[in-house]
Design a protein with these regions (language model features):
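Extended, low-complexity regulatory regions
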Residues: 8-9
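Short beta-strands and strand-loop turn motifs
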Residues: 12-13, 130
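FAD-binding subdomain of flavoenzyme oxidoreductases
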Residues: 105-106, 116-148
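Short Asp/Glu-rich motifs
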Residues: 54, 115-116
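Glycine-rich N-terminal segment of FAD-binding domains in flavoprotein oxidoreductases
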Residues: 13-110
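ATP/NTP phosphate-donor binding region
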Residues: 1-5
Length: 148
């Protein structure tokens, strides 16, 4: 049994076997541990909004978090939202907008620099890079607004 089968990966037909799409926390953690132990270069990818920034990375495996997305809990009266790391900023903004709320920070949208399409990425990408946009000087960084 291969590692992918063991961890219940759902590999897309459009991608090679080197792209892994786990849909739960256990599979994500076990993939990272496995690649670390075997010294396999691993790229972690959400929507790829920051892929063209910085030095290119040569990896043998890509951990695609697009299947690990969604809003887990939203309490508008408490100004609290819990989401999975692969959740797009667009989806979060749409949910907050329903209750006339917004993110305190303003994630950068690098889409216009690369392909002209808006792409603010995922919450996991924003927090890992700590990009906060033009409001950072007034309201702080993205990580300043995260619990846990």
């Amino acid at each position: 049994m291969s590692m992918e089968e063991k961890l219940n990966f759902q590999t897309s037909q459009d991608f090679s076997e080197s792209i892994l799409k786990p849909n739960n926390e256990k599979a994500i953690a076990e993939t990272i541990k496995y690649c670390y132990k075997k010294n396999i270069p691993l790229e972690i990818n959400g929507l790829g909004s920051k892929k063209n920034i910085g030095k290119n990375f040569q990896s043998q495996k890509t951990l695609d978090l697009s299947k690990y997305s969604g809003i887990i809990k939203y309490e508008p009266e408490e100004l609290y939202i819990k989401v999975k790391s692969g959740t797009s900023i667009k989806a979060i903004k749409e949910e907050l907008d329903k209750k006339n709320q917004q993110l305190a920070f303003e994630p950068n949208d690098f889409g216009s620099l690369f392909d002209g399409k808006s792409n603010e990425g995922t919450i996991g990408g924003v927090l890992s890079c700590n990009f906060a946009g033009p409001r950072r000087f007034k309201v702080g960084s993205a990580r300043d607004h995260v619990l846990g």
